[in-house]
Amino acid sequence: MLIATLNHNLPDLTDNLVNQLKRDPFFNQCELVVVDNGSKEQLAKSTTHRLENNVFFGGGFNVVLEYFLSTDHEYLYFLNNDLIFHGPSFLTTSYNEAKYSDATVYSPSVINASVEQCHWKQMWNWGKGLRNVDWVDFQCPLIHRRVLEQIKHYPDELIYGWGLDFYTGCITKQNNWNTVVSDNNTICHLNSQTFKQNKIDIGVSEFCQQADLRMNNFFLNSEFKDVYFELRKHGETYSI
């Protein structure tokens, strides 16, 4: 399994993520890629690769994806660098549950460190174990190789990162592949720390506007237009 994360001017959070991962003995069977995404400050100690400029989440994901496809790893675990989890079995549980459920895309359930829970309700912890869903919000997706081999490269229009998860959901739905969220495995996401700590050269409102505009323009002019709206409705109205 290839584990990957991006760092942009938040070295302490990135190194903390890696230190949490190292608690799990399964970490020693994985390969770690920590891509510095154009930081202007001190690098994370765990950095393995460095990009000269910030290519945002979507661009960084494509950099990792290109590398992943050059390896023989079965899974890519792409983690936001501002995640908190406890205990020594996060990786082991993720891998075992993905295999058990034959999930081509798997995610832990997510607790946001804010007043508001994640907008997409399928990501909440419903206390129901393993749940089949239509797509997962890309906070910490574990993705099987056969999905990424079909995608090959995420659309450049999605450089800001919004829509990578919908695009993946369109591919898995098209192929009738399993997508799973686990209530047995839950992470806490600190949320948008580059903006909250003023570590990025774009305002949060401008970023959200551009990301949303690019995402909607892409899907409204693609073969996945109808599926995109189905996935959005699934996430907004999900219930058990």
Predicted features along the sequence, with ranges:
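Short, well-formed alpha-helical segments that are part of the catalytic scaffolds
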Residues: 10-25
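Glycine-rich, basic loop-to-helix element that forms the pyrophosphate-binding segment
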Residues: 52-68
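Short beta-strand-to-loop acidic/aromatic patch adjacent to the donor-nucleotide binding site
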Residues: 73-84
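Conserved donor-nucleotide/metal-binding helix-loop-beta segment in metal-dependent transferases, i.e.
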Residues: 89-105
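Short beta-strand-to-loop element that shapes/binds the nucleotide-sugar donor at the catalytic cleft/hinge
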Residues: 106-120
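Active-site donor/metal-binding and catalytic loop motifs
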Residues: 111, 181-202
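A recurrent flexible, glycine/aromatic-enriched loop bordering the glycosyltransferase active site
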Residues: 125-143, 161
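Donor nucleotide-sugar recognition loop
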Residues: 138, 152-170, 174-181, 185-188
